[in-house]
Curated annotation (Swiss-Prot):
Name of the molecule in the record: Polyisoprenyl-teichoic acid--peptidoglycan teichoic acid transferase TagU
Gene name of this polypeptide: tagU
GO biological process: cell wall assembly
The enzyme's E.C. designation: 2.7.8.-
Disulfide bonds listed in the record: none
Cytoplasmic topology ranges: 1-4
Keywords: Cell membrane, Cell wall biogenesis/degradation, Membrane, Signal-anchor, Transferase, Transmembrane, Transmembrane helix
Stretches in topological domain Extracellular: 26-303
Lineage: Bacteria, Bacillati, Bacillota, Bacilli, Bacillales
Annotated metabolic or biological route of this protein: Cell wall biogenesis
Gene Ontology CC: plasma membrane
Compartments reported by the entry: Cell membrane
């Protein structure tokens, strides 16, 4: 199931693509308009006409999946950070989940802090720059999802089914072990809990993937959804990306076989309070360099 994480990346933007790129003609216009609305280039790429060449040429690419914790007028912080690298030459994919409390330099801020604070300081542009600097790999594309509004997407597809391996209560919702059905509000609480989980941030990331995969499962039968308008509306309000519509379709066509050889990577480190009393996750230089080497090799980056 973890191999379907790419289908979340593509599917949350154009759920119809998941069914192999075939979708009903009568909703094409609505889907096209939605994908145009969610398109938001990075500031660094606004005058770069070659930004989409990697996808069209089927070269190795990287994607930053960013879940933003935005509530009301509060810009919030990045609730989750996941880097996906795809190499269509050997049909392989690597997924790296970055703990939100990772201590690193915040590019453009002139100081070090938790990596998820980059979003609060400078939005997706600063987040991309900070992740690039932390991993020492280029980030070609990003997909930003407002996790507060993600509940609307879950409700729009009729809720999702997940298998819960840890009984807990969060935000007034109780989650029993086993197979459970989640509404949008429940899904939001389900993906936010981490303090009761002995796996910490890694357990929370696992639950996020479960919910995302549940959305994709519903999206695979998009043409049968009576409320596809609600789905598109929720996506339009809560998703931003620098991928264009054509790039999404090229990616689905040219990179889908990467799912056949997928590797999930956890970043080793140690979490503890610093002298300022704040809890950080520290990644040893050697471990970070090993990760950098692995990703740069996968992306065929030589300089």
């Amino acid at each position: 199931m973890k191999k379907k994480i790419l289908f979340w990346v593509l599917g949350i933007l154009g759920v119809l693509i998941i069914g192999g790129g075939i979708y009903a003609y009568n909703v094409y216009s609505s889907v096209s308009n939605t994908l145009k609305e969610v398109h938001q280039p990075l500031k660094r790429d606004q005058n770069n006409s070659n930004v989409g060449e990697k996808v069209s040429k089927s070269e190795p690419v990287s994607i930053l999946l960013l879940g933003a914790d935005e509530r009301g007028e509060d810009k919030g912080r990045s609730d989750s950070l996941m880097v996906i690298t795809l190499n269509p030459k050997n049909n392989s994919m690597k997924t790296v989940s970055i703990p939100r409390d990772t201590y690193t330099e915040i590019v453009g801020k002139g100081k070090s802090d938790k990596i998820n604070h980059a979003y609060a300081f400078g939005g997706v542009d600063m987040s991309v720059a900070t992740v690039e600097n932390f991993l020492n790999v280029p980030i070609n594309y990003y997909i930003e999802v407002n996790m507060e509004g993600f509940k609307d997407i879950v409700d729009a597809v009729g809720g999702v089914d997940v298998k819960n391996d840890l009984e807990f209560t969060q935000d007034g919702h109780h989650f029993a072990k086993g197979n459970i059905h989640l509404t949008g509000d429940q899904a939001l609480a389900f993906t936010r809990m981490r303090k009761q989980d002995p796996r910490g941030d890694f357990g929370r990331q696992m639950r996020q993937r479960q919910v995302m995969q549940g959305v994709i499962k519903k999206g695979a039968s998009f043409s049968s959804l009576t409320g596809y308008g609600d789905v598109l509306s929720a996506i339009q309000k809560n998703v931003k990306t620098n991928l264009t519509q054509d790039q999404m379709f090229d990616m689905q066509k040219n990179y889908k076989d990467c799912l056949k050889n997928s590797e999930d990577i956890q970043i080793p480190g140690d979490g503890h309070k610093a002298a300022d009393g704040i809890w950080y996750y520290y990644v040893p230089d050697a471990a970070k360099q090993d990760l950098t080497n692995k990703l740069r090799t996968h992306l065929e980056v030589t300089k």
